[in-house]
Design a protein with these regions (language model features):
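PRPP-associated nucleotide enzymes
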Residues: 1-191
């Protein structure tokens, strides 16, 4: 058995798996895939899940608008009070939910940065149910890293990355971090 007093923590090793141009290409492809799957932008609503899903939804909406020549409704969906770990962390400050009009009979695309366990998306489904009855709900993520705990799959994926449980996949966005990148950091401990 290891002695925590004498064990030194494993150093963190980080590597970039996608740079700014690769992130841009992935988002452009995702925008086209969303348009193809929906047969255009009609009735499409993109809802970003904070934090990084919000700027991703804005970017996808701008890319779709560039192709279609008309604006796409987009907003943000806070899931704070729908998370299944509230008992572990009961003090939470709900964020902002901004829905661009009714979502009834719309095709709602939930947008997030990384799909991992599926729990964030499960909470988003619960939050969405309280807001209306969309015709369909789709999921678009920049990164799918596997290791699901819930039976959830993304409809549109920018990049699939195989990562071990002791690795953290992080998305950096210019709006929040000053640059666009996808990194993997080995933490030395299982999540």
């Amino acid at each position: 058995m290891a002695d925590p007093a004498t064990d030194t923590p494993s150093p963190q090793f980080s590597r970039v798996v996608a740079d700014e141009s690769e992130v841009a290409r992935a988002l452009t492809r995702m925008a086209h895939e969303l348009l193809e799957a929906n047969h255009g932008a009609e009735n499409l609503v993109l809802l970003g899940i904070p934090t990084r899903g919000v700027p991703l939804a804005r970017r996808l909406a701008a890319l779709i608008e560039k192709v279609e020549g008309r604006p796409v409704r987009q907003g943000e969906l806070d899931i704070t009070m729908y998370r299944d770990d509230l008992r572990a962390n009961p003090t939470r400050n709900p964020g902002r939910t901004a829905i661009p009009g009714s979502i009834d009979d719309s095709v709602v695309v939930l947008v997030d940065d990384v799909l991992y366990s599926g729990r964030t998306i499960g909470a988003a489904f619960d939050a969405l149910r309280d807001l209306g009855r969309p015709r369909a709900v789709r999921l678009a993520v920049l990164v799918d890293r596997g290791h699901r705990e819930l039976p959830i799959a993304a409809d549109t994926v920018g990049r699939t990355i195989q990562a071990a449980d002791d690795e953290r996949v992080a998305v950096q966005l210019a709006e929040l971090d000053g640059t666009d990148a996808i990194t993997i950091t080995r933490t030395g401990k299982e999540s």
